[in-house]
Amino acid sequence: MSNITVTNLHKSYGDVDALEDVSFEILDGEFVVILGESGAGKSTLLRCLNGLTEPTTGSVKIDGEPVNGPRDDVGMIFQQHNIIEEMTAYTNALSGSLNRTSLVRSLFQWNDREEKLDALRALDTVGLLDDAEQRAGRMSGGQQQRVGISRALVQDPNLLLADEPVASLDPASAESVMGYIKDAADQHDLTTLASLHQVNLAREFGQRFIGMKDGRVIFDGYRDDLTFDVIDDIYGNIQTDAIRTGDDANADVAPTTSSDGGTDAAGGPDQQPASDPHLS
């Protein structure tokens, strides 16, 4: 787990301010959802947190250390998966160990036994152990995103960032993938920040919420604080009739059968498939 301190963060691109005076602190183990319309600054904020984008002014600290570039202890899940479609789910997951081994060793699967086990455990966590040898390009969008989650887990991060991880998925697959992200965060004790624009999903899986508008943080609170008035402030006058509240939004569920074409394998992430051919 990691704690994050963001202080007076500002990022501009020419005359355009993507982030303005953003400050907050995330505690160890929190599952935080960043809400906001497209262009609100969510992606820029996450890229500053993982060191992919350098802020114009202000600072980001993880466990008290300034973020000055990409860090091995920060895993990232992208909207467009960023997986290699010609490779199998297993090989894609194994590539998460690149921060500990060379590209050549990873491509030829010359990884040590523990790294191979890490990849299999990660695929098990997201319900894809039985599909380890399936080529990623033949998988559904939801399954591909789950491969991306497994790759991030193999990186062995303390902090997990997810940038609109379900934006391109249908509602059922989106709920499934968010369930796996929440389950992975719980099992691996990860501090997690996920940007979303689906309020229902945010309320279902989020513990804390940061609302952004025009590059600024306009809300920071918990589920009971995320009222319809707050949602209107973040998104404008949207239809709130279908937004779930109360008990309907409190199910932190990782489904055992996925709507995106995959099913959970038997056993948990600590299961060691000692006879698995990937370990030879």
Curated annotation (Swiss-Prot):
<feature type="region of interest" description="Disordered">
    <location>
        <begin position="246"/>
        <end position="280"/>
    </location>
</feature>
<dbReference type="GO" id="GO:0015416">
    <property type="term" value="F:ABC-type phosphonate transporter activity"/>
</dbReference>
<keyword id="KW-1003">Cell membrane</keyword>
<dbReference type="InterPro" id="IPR017871">
    <property type="entry name" value="ABC_transporter-like_CS"/>
</dbReference>
<dbReference type="GO" id="GO:0016887">
    <property type="term" value="F:ATP hydrolysis activity"/>
</dbReference>
<dbReference type="GO" id="GO:0005886">
    <property type="term" value="C:plasma membrane"/>
</dbReference>
<keyword id="KW-1278">Translocase</keyword>
<protein>
    <recommendedName>
        <fullName>Phosphonates import ATP-binding protein PhnC</fullName>
        <ecNumber>7.3.2.2</ecNumber>
    </recommendedName>
</protein>
<dbReference type="GO" id="GO:0005524">
    <property type="term" value="F:ATP binding"/>
</dbReference>
<dbReference type="InterPro" id="IPR025662">
    <property type="entry name" value="Sigma_54_int_dom_ATP-bd_1"/>
</dbReference>
<dbReference type="InterPro" id="IPR003593">
    <property type="entry name" value="AAA+_ATPase"/>
</dbReference>
<dbReference type="InterPro" id="IPR027417">
    <property type="entry name" value="P-loop_NTPase"/>
</dbReference>
<comment type="subunit">
    <text>The complex is composed of two ATP-binding proteins (PhnC), two transmembrane proteins (PhnE) and a solute-binding protein (PhnD).</text>
</comment>
<keyword id="KW-0813">Transport</keyword>
<feature type="binding site">
    <location>
        <begin position="36"/>
        <end position="43"/>
    </location>
    <ligand>
        <name>ATP</name>
    </ligand>
</feature>
<dbReference type="Pfam" id="PF00005">
    <property type="entry name" value="ABC_tran"/>
</dbReference>
<dbReference type="InterPro" id="IPR050086">
    <property type="entry name" value="MetN_ABC_transporter-like"/>
</dbReference>
<comment type="similarity">
    <text>Belongs to the ABC transporter superfamily. Phosphonates importer (TC 3.A.1.9.1) family.</text>
</comment>
<feature type="domain" description="ABC transporter">
    <location>
        <begin position="4"/>
        <end position="239"/>
    </location>
</feature>
<keyword id="KW-0547">Nucleotide-binding</keyword>
<keyword id="KW-0918">Phosphonate transport</keyword>
<keyword id="KW-0472">Membrane</keyword>
<dbReference type="InterPro" id="IPR003439">
    <property type="entry name" value="ABC_transporter-like_ATP-bd"/>
</dbReference>
<comment type="function">
    <text>Part of the ABC transporter complex PhnCDE involved in phosphonates import. Responsible for energy coupling to the transport system.</text>
</comment>
<keyword id="KW-0067">ATP-binding</keyword>
<dbReference type="InterPro" id="IPR012693">
    <property type="entry name" value="ABC_transpr_PhnC"/>
</dbReference>
